């Protein structure tokens, strides 16, 4: 065993490729308000800071495309419709990234505590993990509404340290975006940056994680 006792993971872009379902849900909601349909590769650049900011970025794009704006009530209604569609399509097109399930199972068998720390709406976290048969592997699930602050704030990692009686150096975090790297480093935790996720089309290495991996299974190499 290494110095690490707990390993925390981001969800979207780290464990699960949820982009197809997120794009479907944005576009379904947009269609109801006569807004343009966004391609997946564009929706990818809006992911990572929670649903409210995703919608804000989407609306800014739609305004630039069409000049159309929504009033506050319409924006609230749009967010509700996005939430409805995403609730209906949590795992319709989404898939686990390669080697995620087997690696998580190996880590659990080795005695590591596992946790999810995501900015995704809290109510969606457990259902997504359950759909892929991995929810039972985690000792804690933190979503966008679990705590007063979300990544890149370090609060979720401080919370994990407090709950499990750990020092930051005993926590390893794994993510795919600059928000993950910043949260971990601010908290004093080591962090893995994965190259395949959603980082606004910016190489994750530019955020200076402690390790950069192309394959989820490579996490095991630093825990031997």
UniProtKB/Swiss-Prot annotation:
Disulfide bonds: none
UniProt KW Hydrolase keyword: yes
GO MF entry, a single one: metal ion binding
Pfam families registered for this protein in UniProt: HAD_2 (PF13419)
Binding, Mg(2+): 10, 12, 176
Pathway, per record: Organic acid metabolism; glycolate biosynthesis; glycolate from 2-phosphoglycolate: step 1/1
UniProt-listed Gene3D superfamilies: HAD superfamily/HAD-like, Putative phosphatase, domain 2
Cofactors that this protein relies on: Mg(2+)
Any one of the GO CC terms: cytosol
Keywords: Carbohydrate metabolism, Hydrolase, Magnesium, Metal-binding
Enzyme Commission code(s) on record: 3.1.3.18
Family label: Belongs to the HAD-like hydrolase superfamily. CbbY/CbbZ/Gph/YieH family.
Stated role: Specifically catalyzes the dephosphorylation of 2-phosphoglycolate. Is involved in the dissimilation of the intracellular 2-phosphoglycolate formed during the DNA repair of 3'-phosphoglycolate ends, a major class of DNA lesions induced by oxidative stress.
PANTHER family: PHOSPHOGLYCOLATE PHOSPHATASE
NCBIfam families: HAD-SF-IA-v1, HAD-SF-IA-v3, PGP_bact, PRK13222.1-2
The name this protein goes by in its record: Phosphoglycolate phosphatase
Organism: Pasteurella multocida (strain Pm70)
Gene name of the record: gph
């Amino acid at each position: 065993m290494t110095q690490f006792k707990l390993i925390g993971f981001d969800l979207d872009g780290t464990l699960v490729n949820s982009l197809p379902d997120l794009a479907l849900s944005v576009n379904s909601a947009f269609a109801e308000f006569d807004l343009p349909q966004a391609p997946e590769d564009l929706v990818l650049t809006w992911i990572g800071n929670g649903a409210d900011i995703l919608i804000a970025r989407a609306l800014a794009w739609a305004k630039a495309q069409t000049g159309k704006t929504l009033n506050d009530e319409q924006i609230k209604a749009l967010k509700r419709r996005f939430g409805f569609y995403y609730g209906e399509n949590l795992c319709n097109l989404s898939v686990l990234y390669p080697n995620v399930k087997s690696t998580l199972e190996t880590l659990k068998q080795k005695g590591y505590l596992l946790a999810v720390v995501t900015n995704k709406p809290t109510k969606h976290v457990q259902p997504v993990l359950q759909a892929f048969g991995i929810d039972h592997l985690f000792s804690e699930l933190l979503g966008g509404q679990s705590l007063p602050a979300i990544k890149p704030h370090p609060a979720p990692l401080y919370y994990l340290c407090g709950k499990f009686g750990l020092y930051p150096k005993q926590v390893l975090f794994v993510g795919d975006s600059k928000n993950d790297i910043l949260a971990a480093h601010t908290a004093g935790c080591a962090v893995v940056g994965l190259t395949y996720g959603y980082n606004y089309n910016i190489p994750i290495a530019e955020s200076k994680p402690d390790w950069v991996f192309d394959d989820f299974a490579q996490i095991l190499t630093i825990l031997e």
